[in-house]
């Protein structure tokens, strides 16, 4: 009876943690994190599997099967077939797999240490920002983590029940984990170490479970191996194109170099649901318990297992898992991004859970400390993420459904080619007369003389629309973040300047300004009478100017005195023949309180030059709600970069929420030197329905 009672309490506590996990993962699911470029790539491959059975990548011009990380597409395809194609559906799929990983980790903790250890490990995962970010993102990481956790849990069950098919299930899950993401090979090393721990070398000479493990792994991963061997040339090319820098090296010098860089991954541990470095007591607790748990595991190994331990090798098993995974990732996982942290968090959470269980067991009469910690930690997690939701809700982020409505206003209906950031694939995938291509797929090639431009994927028979967003494609064109040479950027910019006209601009989206260009391959399209202005799902027209500031007027604005400015800073604001020159360090700038009508919408235009990264027009303030974006977000203010590219829209817009709105022109750069010569504010109003597609004069 006591055991039955304990099991029911354990299951009730686990159900409560599952509810807490859903609280941390379901709200604002399509709003935060912002759509990652990997998500639509993976969704498109799954969509192609659903349609044709082959994981092709049309947006990147890949007409044959993408042969790397093929498992995710085949996992997601039936889910899409059942529930539809969309960002919410894809992210919900990973949320459920993340819950599965939490439950499996709890099972491992319960079967190797104690129910308290299992619940504490589950709580640490369910409250971790990095793990939650992976669960809320439609990437391959969380499905791989789920199958890794399943492989480890199945092994533990097979060991305790002495049933070979559990080992077979463990091997099959390992194969699935590796099909989804190649990084999961680390779990195979851990399982081998566990097997040697339990059976020794003799266990390989006299098979017990490893033959089942191998058979299960070959059942799921074997067919893929056969395809790799048969199509090695294609696989080799795709590795070179997409993952050449991520292949593990085997030279000791390279391994040591990679290990020295591993600290970069841990610096980004916080990144996930919480997307910026802010005080995070949950993370501090997790880190502390992990460190304490590693030490206590070593101590427990030295003094021997406790009398009540369900697994005599439990401490050694968890230490191998936590430390072994960390060592493998340090030396052999070259990409040091924090999105791979959930793999490591399996072992870290179990080490932390062991610490909670061990400490509560070592204190006579305080066995309640373990369950109390789990309850308190869960409540603290709910409160913390409620606060984060509130804070992030004041940012520029909006649900993707809002972005979808904006994109449909920007792009004309009918047959067309759309070149844009991969994030926008979800909007256009179902349009039969639209060919959506990632900007990275093509490079305009000037035919010279009378020959038209060649643009991969496009012909002169249909309109060409470019959707250049401020946060992804524009930085690529300005700085070449992912392209190895400047020719790609120069050719795209030249194409935009010579063969395109700006047809519409969406202001205040979750992706900054999105500019819609109408382009042709030969010559230049006819200029429009104006540019349409879009905010959210509404088009706007300019009514009249309400404020016009020349350089002389700007020179009379109040000089900005930033509270962070050190006494050694040398900010400068001076009126010159070209305008007001803002230079120096210490956040130099000028500000003015603009008299606004709450609820009205305004467009802000600046004339500036020599601007660089960090030079901003800040509308509103974070201290009090004064503005919102045209999409209804950014209630904590709109810190808008002063765009240097002349071919890209430079206006900003806002909805006034207060009778006075602060307008601040300044720089966050370590040092700056730019000129602003004028600033104009114009009132906007929704365009009448009959002229909703009419252009707005500039």
Regions found by a protein language model. Name each.
Residues 4-9, 106, 110-111, 117, ...:
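Membrane-interface helix-loop-helix junctions at transmembrane boundaries of multi-pass membrane enzymes
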Residues 408-444, 464-473:
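Short periplasmic/luminal acceptor-recognition loop of GT-C membrane glycosyltransferases, typified by
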Residues 42, 48, 176, 188-305, ...:
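Transmembrane-lumen/periplasm boundary regions of multi-pass, lipid-linked membrane glycan transferases
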Residues 110-112, 116, 151-167, 177, ...:
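Membrane-interface transmembrane helices that cradle and orient dolichyl/undecaprenyl
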Residues 92-112, 150, 154:
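Transmembrane-helix motifs of polytopic, lipid-linked glycan transferases
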Residues 134-135, 141-144, 177, 186, ...:
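Hydrophobic/aromatic-rich transmembrane helices and adjacent perimembrane loops
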Residues 14, 18, 218, 356-386:
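Signature aromatic-anchored transmembrane alpha helix within multi-pass, membrane-resident enzymes
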Residues 22-28, 40-74, 78, 249:
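Extracytosolic helix-loop segments that constitute the early lumenal/periplasmic catalytic or substrate-binding loops
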């Amino acid at each position: 009876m006591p055991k039955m009672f304990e099991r029911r309490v354990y299951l009730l506590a686990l159900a409560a943690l599952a509810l807490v996990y859903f609280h941390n993962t379901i709200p604002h699911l399509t709003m935060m994190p912002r759509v990652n470029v990997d998500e639509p790539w993976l969704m498109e491959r799954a969509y192609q599997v659903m349609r044709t059975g082959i994981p092709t990548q049309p947006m990147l011009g890949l007409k044959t099967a993408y042969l790397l990380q093929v498992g995710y597409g085949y996992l997601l395809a039936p889910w899409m077939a059942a529930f539809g194609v969309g960002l919410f559906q894809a992210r919900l799929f990973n949320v459920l797999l993340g819950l599965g990983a939490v439950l499996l980790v709890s099972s491992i903790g319960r079967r190797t240490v104690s129910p308290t250890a299992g619940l504490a490990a589950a709580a640490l995962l369910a409250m971790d920002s990095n793990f939650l970010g992976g669960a809320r993102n439609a990437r391959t990481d969380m499905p791989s983590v789920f199958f890794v956790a399943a492989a480890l849990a199945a092994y533990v069950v097979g060991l305790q029940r002495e049933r070979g098919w559990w080992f077979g299930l463990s091997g099959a899950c390992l194969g699935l984990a590796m099909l989804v993401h190649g990084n999961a090979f680390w779990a195979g090393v851990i399982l081998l170490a566990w097997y040697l721990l339990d059976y020794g070398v003799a266990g390989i000479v006299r098979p017990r479970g490893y033959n089942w493990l191998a058979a299960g792994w070959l059942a799921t991963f074997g067919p893929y191996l056969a395809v790799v061997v048969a199509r090695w040339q294609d696989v080799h090319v795709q590795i070179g194109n997409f993952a050449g820098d991520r292949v593990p090296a085997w030279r000791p010098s390279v391994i040591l170099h990679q290990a020295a860089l591993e600290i970069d991954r841990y610096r980004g541990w916080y990144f996930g649901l919480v997307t910026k470095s802010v005080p995070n007591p949950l993370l501090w607790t997790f880190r502390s318990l992990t460190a304490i748990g590693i030490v206590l595991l070593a101590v427990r190994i030295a003094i021997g297992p406790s009398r009540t331990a369900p697994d005599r090798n439990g401490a050694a098993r968890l230490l191998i898992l936590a430390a072994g995974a960390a060592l493998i990732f340090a030396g052999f996982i070259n990409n040091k991004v924090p999105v791979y942290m959930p793999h490591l968090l399996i072992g870290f959470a179990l080490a932390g859970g062991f610490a909670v269980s061990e400490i509560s067991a070592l204190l006579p009469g305080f066995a309640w400390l373990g369950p109390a910690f789990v309850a308190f930690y869960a409540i603290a997690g709910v409160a913390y993420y409620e606060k984060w939701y509130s804070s992030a809700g004041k940012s520029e982020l909006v649900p993707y459904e809002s972005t979808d409505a904006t994109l449909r206003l920007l792009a004309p209906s009918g047959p067309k080619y759309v070149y844009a950031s991969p994030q926008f694939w979800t909007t256009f995938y179902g349009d039969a007369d639209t060919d959506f291509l990632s900007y990275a797929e093509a490079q305009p090639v000037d035919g010279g003389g009378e020959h038209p431009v060649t643009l991969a994927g496009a012909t002169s028979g249909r309109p060409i629309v470019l959707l250049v967003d401020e946060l992804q494609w524009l930085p690529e064109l300005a700085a070449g973040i992912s392209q190895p040479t400047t020719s790609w950027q120069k050719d795209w910019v030249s194409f935009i300047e010579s063969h395109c006209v700006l047809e519409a601009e969406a202001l205040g989206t979750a992706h900054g300004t999105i500019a819609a260009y109408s382009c042709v391959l030969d010559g230049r399209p006819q200029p429009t009478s104006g540019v349409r202005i879009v905010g959210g799902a509404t088009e706007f027209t300019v009514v009249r100017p309400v404020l016009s500031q020349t350089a002389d007027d700007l020179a009379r604005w109040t000089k900005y005195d930033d509270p962070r400015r050190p006494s050694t800073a040398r900010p400068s604001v001076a009126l010159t023949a070209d305008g007001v020159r803002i230079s120096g360090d210490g956040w130099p700038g000028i500000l003015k309180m603009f008299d606004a009508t709450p609820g009205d919408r305004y467009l802000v235009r600046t004339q500036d030059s020599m601007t660089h990264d960090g030079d901003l027009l800040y509308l509103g303030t974070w201290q009090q709600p004064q503005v919102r974006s045209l999409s209804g977000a950014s209630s904590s203010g709109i810190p808008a970069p002063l765009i240097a590219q002349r071919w890209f829209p430079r206006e900003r817009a806002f909805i006034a929420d207060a009778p006075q709105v602060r307008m601040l022109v300044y720089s966050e750069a370590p040092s700056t030197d730019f000129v602003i010569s004028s600033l104009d504010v114009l009132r906007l109003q929704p365009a009448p329905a009959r002229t909703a597609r009419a252009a707005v004069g500039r």
